[in-house]
Every structure is written in structure tokens, then in C-alpha cells.
Amino acid sequence: MRGVCPRRVRDGTEPAVISRYPEAVTGSVPRPLLFLDVDGPLIPFGAAPRRYPVYGVASAPGAGGNPLLARIDPEHGVRLRMLPCDLVWATSWMADANECIAPRLGLPQLPVVTWPGAPDTGQHDERDGLHWKTRALVGWAAGRSFAWVDDEITRTDRAWVSAHHPGPALLHRVDPGTGLTSADYLTLGRWLRTAGGLPHPRTAPGLVNGPASCG
């Protein structure tokens, strides 16, 4: 699905990967993390014959970019920044998410989860029905409260996180046919405020709870 990122560095170097939020951002009481997938939540797919809206162009002509990038609604960036959390890319796009996705959403360079190359563990998890991201995300969070937004989350993942993660966690599955919706943002906003010990201000219908900036 990914194709080629038109902003990918072509000289053999890799874009910088931010591995963690610095202490100055997290402070003594860190906000919840939000691990964000791209394909499904931000780039809807698989709902043929539905025609998806197109927002701008995927890439310059001849750049070999992924045409599905044009499905990314820039409004997601506004809504994500309103959530009281620290955003982290948790996607197979890895560093390309900062190069290709973040600019379309008006987001800064975000930390990126890098997936460990442990084929034996991955094969074992797959046999047990555990998603290949789950173990790495729990390790990355290191006990910190987190929400994980993905289109492939199952009961097995929720049970594993409940047994292995000491802090609050929300594993929120998004319908890949629609991507993130207002209802999803409402659920995320409420949970993140509760996990972060914040009040729940009244908001107009369709708006995300909270003025705090994510990222």
C-alpha cells in the first residue's frame, strides 16, 4: 500500500528518527502517549466501490509517490493536535511518516517506534494471534499510559496488554473503510483526559475534547 514517499531522501541517507520525547516535553508527570498507525486510521482503504474524497495531490508528477496519500484529510492534523497526549508514529511507514504524512497534517516531526528485527518472536506472536506491533509498543511505553490507534487490533492484543502493561491503556480499533471519525476522536479525547487526570470540559458536538496541543 505504501508505495514510494516523494520526500524520501534519495542520496542513501535516512531521515532522522526521533526515538523518544525529551524530558523537557514530558516533565515529571508525562501526558499519555498516543501510538498512531497510518494505513487505515489516516489513509482509509478497502471499502470498494466507495469513492474516497481526495485532498490535494499525492505527489509531483513523475515523483513515483503513493496515490493514496491524497486520501489524507488535513483536518486530522487539527484534531490530533487538540488531543491531550504526546503523539508517536506506530506504523510500517516508520521515518517516512515524518517525511510524507506529517507535512500534510501540519504536524511537527514526531517520535517513531522502530520495530525490532526478532523473527522468532514475531513468528511466535503471530501463531498466538498477537499483533506484531503489540509487544514493541508496550516496551516503548515503559509503563506510561497510552492509547493505540490501529485498524488491526484484536481481543488478543487487549488481553496481552492488560497482562503485561502496568499503566492505563486504550487499544482503539478504527474501521479502515472510514478512517478516524468524529466518534473516534470523542472516545480518544475522553479517555486521554481521564488517563491524564484532566477535567472533561463541555464541547460542541463533533469537536474534540480539550485544548491541549498534541506533539
Roles of regions detected by a PLM:
Residues 7, 23, 37, 54-57, ...:
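Intrinsically disordered, low-complexity regions enriched in small/polar residues
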Residues 100-215:
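C-terminal cap/substrate-recognition subdomain and adjoining C-terminal extension
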Residues 2-36, 46, 197-215:
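Non-catalytic pre-domain segments flanking phosphatase-related domains
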Residues 25-26, 79-80, 139-140, 164:
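A general structural signal for short secondary-structure junctions and capping/turn motifs
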